[in-house]
Amino acid sequence: MEVGYSNTVVLRHVKQALENLLAGNVCLTEGVREIAQWRWANHGLNEALFRPFVGVDSETDSFPVGRLRELWSEDGLARADAERVAAEGRYREWILESGGIMLDAVVAALPTSTFTDPASS
């Protein structure tokens, strides 16, 4: 099932998040979270493309990433990072494959995307 219309701004955000994840610019956990947050936005993509990211986000939601890490003790971070790295190892191949498939879908959708909802015209 497709969600909403193909909004150019949303697709650009999803594309950037996918490119960052696939290039290794962010850890797998952070990349998955960035992608999963767009699942209900107007992207016009098949919602099934988001399922791997939503699932792994759910499995890794206890791990601190980004600015949240500043609030953790060194010992706590060391333990959480060891667990996170192990979890990311289990999901890496699946997520990178899913990311490539989703990026292809985003790139294909961008040329026909719009900045406004065509139904509101």
Placement of each model-derived feature along the sequence:
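Acidic, Ser/Pro/Thr-rich low-complexity regulatory regions
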Residues: M1-S121
